[in-house]
């Protein structure tokens, strides 16, 4: 028998110290990694529920285990809320991650060796869009499209490439692209060559849910997303479609279970249901509007301080700063900003002369800072501090500037806590 008074702090103090340290790090650092966000206490409460004990292989009403009546309620709630949120008529909430959702799409609709055409990782795509080190580039024949020197997708070049390689699937979506993707044009290209259009909207799902970024559902055969980036929910994946093809829906369900996964994580599905309910609230749209406003405000400061922004701006939650002209690497910038308690990630930029582990840029995202209450004035000030640190790298005053910036960061983090 377990007592509810049991706690980690008493039982495993070494682990608890790591948890406490991470809690403190999140409160005392400014989080600008575009793929991260803060989950609400309600989402975390669902994740910590007793549903973690329940096995529920199968789908609602068609389980392989008994005692799933409440798991069915939870999963159906999540499905219906996701349908309402995105305008889908098919939803699978079981994928454990975005990568597993993508794997299920490939497995359900393709055969090994089929050709896929996705955005190159070096140009802003994702590992699972056909990178050679990923299953998507090992199991399938992956062709890659890129972006122009201006940081934009060239749809004419994409069309020509699609006609040349004749893919069975075109993959839309990105992990580091700051402009609006023309989903309609991508579908037109896919139709011309008889390909599926699959869109991974993991990075912009929250913006899509709020109506601020174009919804790919009306154009794609199938869409996937994570639930923890701009959506702000638990770590997990999601598959959606409104194509109306029941055969595709059956293939996708079978590719998730039993082909790709066993039992679903019911406690995480419960947390997804909470996240979708939160995203249906009126204040969620205001939050996402502020995410975009804050990203645009930061871009203007970087440009004023003579830092090149890839594509010269942003129409979503992220942007890339190209450091080539300043003689800096992304690795050095990431490290210096980290010492000042500002967390970003190094990122490749178009025609990057550096290796992927070094890079010549940084990726900056605003979902987390916006969720903890930063407004446009706050992020403009923050962008200025970041430029101060970047300007000082390798100079005599570097340590002094970093220390001064860290003090400012700690002060604003105290004023705007993540969890008050």
UniProtKB/Swiss-Prot annotation:
<keyword id="KW-0554">One-carbon metabolism</keyword>
<dbReference type="InterPro" id="IPR019798">
    <property type="entry name" value="Ser_HO-MeTrfase_PLP_BS"/>
</dbReference>
<dbReference type="GO" id="GO:0030170">
    <property type="term" value="F:pyridoxal phosphate binding"/>
</dbReference>
<dbReference type="GO" id="GO:0019264">
    <property type="term" value="P:glycine biosynthetic process from serine"/>
</dbReference>
<dbReference type="GO" id="GO:0004372">
    <property type="term" value="F:glycine hydroxymethyltransferase activity"/>
</dbReference>
<keyword id="KW-0028">Amino-acid biosynthesis</keyword>
<feature type="binding site">
    <location>
        <begin position="125"/>
        <end position="127"/>
    </location>
    <ligand>
        <name>(6S)-5,6,7,8-tetrahydrofolate</name>
    </ligand>
</feature>
<dbReference type="InterPro" id="IPR015424">
    <property type="entry name" value="PyrdxlP-dep_Trfase"/>
</dbReference>
<protein>
    <recommendedName>
        <fullName>Serine hydroxymethyltransferase</fullName>
        <ecNumber>2.1.2.1</ecNumber>
    </recommendedName>
</protein>
<keyword id="KW-0963">Cytoplasm</keyword>
<dbReference type="GO" id="GO:0005829">
    <property type="term" value="C:cytosol"/>
</dbReference>
<dbReference type="Pfam" id="PF00464">
    <property type="entry name" value="SHMT"/>
</dbReference>
<comment type="subunit">
    <text>Homodimer.</text>
</comment>
<feature type="modified residue" description="N6-(pyridoxal phosphate)lysine">
    <location>
        <position position="229"/>
    </location>
</feature>
<dbReference type="GO" id="GO:0035999">
    <property type="term" value="P:tetrahydrofolate interconversion"/>
</dbReference>
<dbReference type="InterPro" id="IPR015421">
    <property type="entry name" value="PyrdxlP-dep_Trfase_major"/>
</dbReference>
<keyword id="KW-0808">Transferase</keyword>
<feature type="binding site">
    <location>
        <position position="121"/>
    </location>
    <ligand>
        <name>(6S)-5,6,7,8-tetrahydrofolate</name>
    </ligand>
</feature>
<comment type="pathway">
    <text>One-carbon metabolism; tetrahydrofolate interconversion.</text>
</comment>
<feature type="site" description="Plays an important role in substrate specificity">
    <location>
        <position position="228"/>
    </location>
</feature>
<keyword id="KW-0663">Pyridoxal phosphate</keyword>
<dbReference type="InterPro" id="IPR039429">
    <property type="entry name" value="SHMT-like_dom"/>
</dbReference>
<comment type="pathway">
    <text>Amino-acid biosynthesis; glycine biosynthesis; glycine from L-serine: step 1/1.</text>
</comment>
<dbReference type="InterPro" id="IPR001085">
    <property type="entry name" value="Ser_HO-MeTrfase"/>
</dbReference>
<dbReference type="InterPro" id="IPR015422">
    <property type="entry name" value="PyrdxlP-dep_Trfase_small"/>
</dbReference>
<dbReference type="InterPro" id="IPR049943">
    <property type="entry name" value="Ser_HO-MeTrfase-like"/>
</dbReference>
<comment type="function">
    <text>Catalyzes the reversible interconversion of serine and glycine with tetrahydrofolate (THF) serving as the one-carbon carrier. This reaction serves as the major source of one-carbon groups required for the biosynthesis of purines, thymidylate, methionine, and other important biomolecules. Also exhibits THF-independent aldolase activity toward beta-hydroxyamino acids, producing glycine and aldehydes, via a retro-aldol mechanism.</text>
</comment>
<comment type="similarity">
    <text>Belongs to the SHMT family.</text>
</comment>
């Amino acid at each position: 028998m377990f007592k509810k008074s049991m706690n980690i702090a008493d039982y495993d103090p070494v682990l608890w110290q790591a948890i406490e340290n991470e809690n403190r790090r999140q409160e005392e650092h400014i989080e600008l990694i575009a793929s991260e966000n803060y989950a609400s206490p309600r989402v975390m409460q669902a994740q910590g529920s007793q549903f973690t004990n329940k096995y529920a292989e199968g789908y609602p009403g068609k389980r392989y285990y008994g005692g799933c009546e409440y798991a069915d309620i939870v999963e159906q709630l999540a499905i219906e809320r996701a349908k309402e949120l995105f305008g889908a008529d098919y939803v699978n909430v079981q994928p454990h991650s975005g990568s597993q959702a993508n794997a299920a799409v490939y497995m359900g609709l393709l055969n090994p060796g089929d050709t896929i055409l996705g955005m190159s990782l070096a140009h802003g795509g994702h590992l699972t869009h056909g990178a050679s080190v990923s299953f998507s580039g090992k199991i399938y024949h992956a062709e890659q499209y890129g972006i122009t020197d201006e940081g934009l997708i060239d749809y004419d070049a994409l069309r020509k490439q699609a006609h040349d390689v004749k893919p069975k699937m075109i993959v839309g979506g990105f992990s580091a692209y700051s402009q609006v993707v023309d989903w309609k044009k991508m579908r037109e290209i896919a139709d011309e060559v008889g390909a599926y259009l699959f869109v991974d909207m993991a990075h912009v799902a929250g913006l899509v849910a709020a109506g601020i970024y174009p919804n790919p559902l009306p154009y794609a055969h199938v869409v996937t997303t994570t639930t923890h980036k701009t959506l702000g929910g638990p770590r997990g994946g999601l598959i959606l479609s409104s194509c109306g093809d029941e055969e595709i829906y059956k293939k996708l369900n079978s590719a998730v279970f039993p082909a790709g996964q066993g039992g679903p994580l019911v406690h995480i599905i419960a947390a997804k249901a909470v996240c979708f309910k939160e995203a249906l609230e009126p204040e969620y749209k205001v939050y996402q509007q502020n995410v975009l406003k804050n990203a645009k405000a930061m871009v203007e400061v970087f440009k004023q301080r003579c830092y090149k922004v890839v594509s010269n701006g942003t129409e979503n939650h992220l942007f890339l700063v190209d450091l080539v002209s300043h003689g800096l690497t992304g690795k050095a910038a990431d490290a210096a900003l980290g010492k000042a308690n500002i967390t970003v990630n190094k990122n490749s930029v178009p025609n990057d002369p550096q290796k992927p582990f070094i890079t010549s840029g940084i990726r900056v995202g605003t979902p987390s800072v916006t969720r903890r209450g930063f407004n446009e004035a706050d992020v403009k000030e923050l962008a200025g501090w970041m430029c101060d640190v970047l300007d000082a790298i390798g100079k005599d005053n570097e340590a002094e500037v970093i220390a001064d910036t860290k003090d400012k960061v700690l002060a604003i983090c105290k004023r705007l806590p993540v969890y008050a």
